[in-house]
Amino acid sequence: ISDVIDTNTVKVIMDVNQKALAYSRHPIPFPKSNIAKYDKQLGLYAFKQSGLQVFSENLPASLEKIESVEMYRLLEHGYSIQMVKTNDVSISVDTPSDLEQATALMKQDSLFGKY
């Protein structure tokens, strides 16, 4: 539940084909009932060169400015964003405390020091 109320965690709503419909730093959909389910955006982006060109040529639109979620730049200009569900757990690194936690986890990785 902490991720749901954490404004550093971006939540995403997807359609039945796992295309992004909306992002927010607040709980979406609104939890009017106890059946609300939340998906967290991991924030790992894969672009073709042409996609990067489109992203860089478009200016931030209103929702990107309001939510501080850069993927709104594409959604607001009519582009679709394919999401991929994963069961992997991730942590966000937004604060010095998060960085300490991430560093401690990396040091436990058997490949630490090789990357």
Residue ranges and their predicted role:
Residues 1-59:
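Conserved core of the sugar-phosphate nucleotidyltransferase
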Residues 34-115:
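Conserved alpha/beta core of the MobA/IspD/sugar-nucleotide pyrophosphorylase nucleotidyltransferase superfamily
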